């Protein structure tokens, strides 16, 4: 109530300048769904390895006005059969939720259909969203470092606030096995960081130089 009442607006334009103009017009008194980020994730899911993952945050509210960004993957307007259909492909939904849930900036919003399913069918993504929510709650603290050196594999790193926190999300759209090196810190040398998403990759041991 009063000054503590939260509001968010929806302006369905994949045009950052128009979205910034909207925020200016309302005096930044409301936040805004980051439609640009949604369309970047949609394009990434459609183009697969032809999409340059280094561009995933380009032309987005979360990159330019992070305190005003409500990040989301899909919603009722983007699902199949709607007038504004732009549903992120299934294979990229875990990547997309890793982006919005493990990033420092933005207020992430889950889509009911991605979590519970649509039309009576149980969502295949609920378990990974639950896992990412757990990682967010326990580990996703501190500053964010985006490792954007390769078009087909990137990493989102949270540096942590104490010895128990910090995480790295590695995202790839390549059909081939890719590698990426992330500097974790020499103080964490010898630690074993667990792979928690159930992929085929093994746990990672931080080397003596603090790299993973």
Protein language model annotation of sequence segments:
Residues 1-212:
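Active-site-proximal helices and loops of the catalytic beta/alpha 8
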